[in-house]
Amino acid sequence: MLHSFRRSLLLLALCTPAVLAQKKVKEVKPGAVELKRLENQWAAGLVRRDRALFDRLLAKRFIYTENDKMMQRDDVLHEVAEGTDTVTAARNEDMDVHEFGATTAVVTGWLIVDGRSKGQPFTHRYRFTDTWVKRKAGWQIVAAQDYLAPR
């Protein structure tokens, strides 16, 4: 009996570190899946110059900052539809969704944009922080901040 008890203690001592070292499986929340989908729509909308998409996604009082400039919703809509740069490809990488209750979330990640400006090709890598609010009609972005990462 004592031998059996010692064997159980030894087994417990050997197994406990392995159990504790296991990585916790990250829970995927439905809001996170939806927000990543919307962020990817944003990237695709840049290529298509999809004003209707941005009109739907951007809240009425949306604000955007990029490096040293700030724009309101109407400025962003104009830039998307009629801006001088041509975006040929855009994709998101390493997105994380930080939910604050059921109706507010912040999405962080990288946006990589390829295109042409004044006849010259470019590839820009932006670090972004987007703040989303869930309304009756669905998620809308209320604020976005991007900065152009140094090469």
Pin down the residues of each PLM region:
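Cleaved targeting-peptide boundary
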Residues: Q22-P30
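Short, surface-exposed coil-to-beta transition loops
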Residues: A90-E93, T108-W110, T123-F128, V142
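A solvent-exposed, acidic/Ser-Thr-rich amphipathic alpha-helical stretch
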Residues: K29-K36, R48-T103, R116, Q120-H124
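A short, structured loop/turn motif at beta-sheet edges
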Residues: V97-A105, W132-G138
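A short hydrophobic beta-strand element
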Residues: T103-V113
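Short beta-strand edge/turn micro-motifs at domain boundaries
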Residues: R125-P150
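N-terminal export leaders
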Residues: R6-L10
